[in-house]
Amino acid sequence: MKSGIHPDYHPVVFQDATTGATFLTRSTITSSRTIEWETPHGVRTYPLVVVEITSDSHPFWTGSRRIVDTAGQVEKFHRRYGSRRQTNHRDDAAHSP
């Protein structure tokens, strides 16, 4: 591999925000939050990334239904950017002198 062109690929702990389940894997993502994780070589500190849905809570893997708050995301978008009215440029061109 060429040195200096690849992102830093390191161990990271992901935590499911719903269930609290954690798992250690490798990723290029970084976080200022950390967690102590017990390994066969002793306790080590790893970056902690909290995610909304993992295989531990996703309906496809659990077989149960779970309502995801997409409506809240849409409302947040409308509050932030407002409901902008789309103009029809053909109508504007027809009424211009």
From Swiss-Prot:
Part of the 50S ribosomal subunit. SUPFAM superfamilies: L28p-like (SSF143800). Belongs to the bacterial ribosomal protein bL31 family. Type B subfamily. This is Large ribosomal subunit protein bL31B. Gene3D superfamilies: Ribosomal protein L31. GO terms for cellular component: ribonucleoprotein complex; ribosome. One of its GO terms (molecular function) is structural constituent of ribosome. Pfam families: Ribosomal_L31. It comes from the Bacteria. Keywords: Ribonucleoprotein, Ribosomal protein. GO terms for biological process: translation.
